[in-house]
């Protein structure tokens, strides 16, 4: 239940395209700076408070067909680390960093204890990252957040989006 019948792993790309895995030399894992979920099923970091509403509104997290708000929560680094390992991800792309710009505090899930998330809390940056294209121009707290993600999942964020347009992207 709660899954697709398609293979959503990097190995599924090889099968779907009809090419051998040795011809794939880079695997880019893509994750939002927070977590969302469409439909039913478990979502350990789901937020039911104003933070969840803010993520949905600022991130425009509404279904394209139904218009229903997507379920939003803090970034689950345990799940992301597992996905990166399972897919042999070589580079990480973090999207929607700008959605977190107005958050005073930002949490990430670093473990589970009795089916509950264990969080690490970060200070927000409370300034706009929208449109920034150079990593060094990011607010210091945003860089701390990204560095922690990279260290935890053991993958460099070589692409970071800071807005909805293609040109609002940091390439490292």
Predicted segments with their positions:
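Non-transmembrane, aqueous-exposed alpha-helical and coiled segments at domain scale
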Residues: 1-172
């Amino acid at each position: 239940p709660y899954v697709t019948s398609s293979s959503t792993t990097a190995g599924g790309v090889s099968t779907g395209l009809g090419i051998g895995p040795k011809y794939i030399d880079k695997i880019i894992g893509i994750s939002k700076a927070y977590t969302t979920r469409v439909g039913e099923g478990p979502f350990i970091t789901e937020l039911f408070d104003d933070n969840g509403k803010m993520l949905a509104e600022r991130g425009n997290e509404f279904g394209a067909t139904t218009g229903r708000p997507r379920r939003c929560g803090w970034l689950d680094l345990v799940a992301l680390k597992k996905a990166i390992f399972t897919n042999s991800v070589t580079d990480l792309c973090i999207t929607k960093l700008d959605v977190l710009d107005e958050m005073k505090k930002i949490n990430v899930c670093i473990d589970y204890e009795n089916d509950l998330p264990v969080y690490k809390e970060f200070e927000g940056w409370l300034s706009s990252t929208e449109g920034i294209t150079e990593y060094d121009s990011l607010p210091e707290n945003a860089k701390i957040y990204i560095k922690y993600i990279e260290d935890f999942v053991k993958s460099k964020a070589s692409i970071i989006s800071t807005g909805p347009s293609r040109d609002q992207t940091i390439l490292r």
